[in-house]
Amino acid sequence: MRLLAVVVLALLAVSQAEEGARLLASKSLLNRYAVEGRDLTLQYNIYNVGSSAALDVELSDDSFPPEDFGIVSGMLNVKWDRIAPASNVSHTVVLRPLKAGYFNFTSATITYLAQEDGPVVIGSTSAPGQGGILAQREFDRRFSPHFLDWAAFGVMTLPSIGIPLLLWYSSKRKYDTPKPKKN
């Protein structure tokens, strides 16, 4: 009898815990390289895996100080009235890094109501972690096509190829006299 009561209480607790909204949130950088002065794209994905709609959902990311990053498009603080169960929402922000160096990309905060008259639930997104922001000059040095460098290389190799070619050609012209034709 006690075992039956414990099982019923456990099932009741599990069913109560599964009611309401549950949000899973991720934050990801879409750029392969973060470069000073170039656009850096962030994407926030929020999934409602709960059984009811999440209400008054607010995403807030305070990890990008205005002295280090400029906002090109989008907002770092966003609010949705509701996110339906078994659905997702994506939000994209484009930033422009103003300084080069290492930066810790921390998680954003998400707050919502799991049920209409329930308490406010506070959560965090995933954190991309520490990443390097390359200086524009360093990025160009590593990844530009280097046309000027290749042109300079070609000009510098011309004497080592051209002088032996000219010597051979003058020698060939001197010693290869055409045979006179007999009439």
Swiss-Prot record:
Keyword Transit peptide: no
Sorted UniProt keywords: Endoplasmic reticulum, Glycoprotein, Membrane, Signal, Transmembrane, Transmembrane helix
Annotated InterPro entries: TRAP_beta
Glycosylation, residue list: N88, N104
Residue intervals on the Lumenal side: 18-146
Protein topology in the membrane: Single-pass type I membrane protein
Keyword Coiled coil: no
Signal sequence bounds: 1-17
Intervals, Cytoplasmic compartment: 168-183
Transmembrane portions of the chain: 147-167
Cell compartment(s), UniProt: Endoplasmic reticulum membrane
GO CC entries: endoplasmic reticulum membrane
Source superkingdom: Eukaryota
GO BP terms: in utero embryonic development
Quaternary state and interactors: Heterotetramer of TRAP-alpha, TRAP-beta, TRAP-delta and TRAP-gamma. Interacts with STING1.
Role description: TRAP proteins are part of a complex whose function is to bind calcium to the ER membrane and thereby regulate the retention of ER resident proteins.
Cross-referenced PANTHER family: TRANSLOCON-ASSOCIATED PROTEIN SUBUNIT BETA, TRANSLOCON-ASSOCIATED PROTEIN, BETA SUBUNIT PRECURSOR TRAP-BETA SIGNAL SEQUENCE RECEPTOR BETA SUBUNIT
Family: Belongs to the TRAP-beta family.
Full protein name: Translocon-associated protein subunit beta
Organism: Mus musculus (Mouse)
Gene name, Swiss-Prot/TrEMBL: Ssr2
